[in-house]
Design a protein with these regions (language model features):
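A post-motif C-terminal structural segment
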Residues: 1-212
Length: 212
């Protein structure tokens, strides 16, 4: 929940001053998301300084208490549902896919994509149980690394591949939509279309505030 920065500024200090409760393990996450008295929740590692989740493939027993993206996402959904029962908007990012692209690491790139896929499944399962008009949109703001796979590979064998850069590319990215008004997502062609898609189906914030 929330991101980090690497310029020496410790985000958790300002968040605590603003009334946020910082949860850094599974136990605190469960307790914090269930506590009705907590109105602002964050999950930052290393004080918000390069506080990324460990890559899935690099997790060791030392990191077994660190929640994964699926757990953080479901906790955030439950937290918001409890406090805003009439509706809310949330952005969930599988940022480690991007990081693996920058480092041209095929192993982490594939595994983090799988982890994000697992998160999308969990979010969809949660949404299906809610009696609400829910829209789930899955896309990316860009591709990273210029990854290209070459030919077929046997099951269990990493594919032959090349990278063209360590930065973002202009490669097209997919858009998937599920739920309420999902058919309107077919018109999305540019990044800015995502904004207009939600603007047209989500009530203004003033209306949501009044409902909640």
């Amino acid at each position: 929940l929330m991101g980090g920065r690497a310029d020496g500024y410790f985000i958790d200090e300002s968040l605590l001053e603003a009334g946020y409760k910082n949860v850094t393990n599974r136990e605190l996450l469960a307790a914090g998301s269930a506590d009705q008295k907590v109105m602002h929740l964050a999950s930052l590692y290393d004080g918000g300084k390069k506080g990324h989740l460990k890559y899935t493939l690099e997790r060791s027993p030392d990191h077994e208490d660190q929640a994964n993206l699926s757990e953080l996402s479901i906790a955030a959904l439950k937290f918001l549902k409890q406090r805003f029962p009439k509706g809310f908007f949330i952005v969930i990012e599988g940022a480690r896919i991007d990081h693996a692209g920058h480092s041209n690491n095929i192993y982490n790139n594939i595994r983090e994509t799988q982890s994000f896929h697992e998160t999308v499944k969990k979010v969809q399962e949660w949404a299906e149980k809610q009696n609400a008009k829910t829209t789930l949109l899955v896309t990316a703001d860009h591709e990273t690394g210029g990854l290209e796979l070459h030919g077929d590979s046997p099951k269990g064998v990493w594919p032959a591949h090349t990278w063209s850069t360590g930065w973002h590319t202009d490669q097209k990215v997919p858009v998937y939509a599920w739920g309420y008004a999902s058919e309107k997502a077919e018109k999305i062609r540019h990044n800015t279309d995502v904004y207009h898609f939600f603007k047209n189906i989500v009530p203004p914030s003033s209306e949501l505030a009044a409902k909640n």
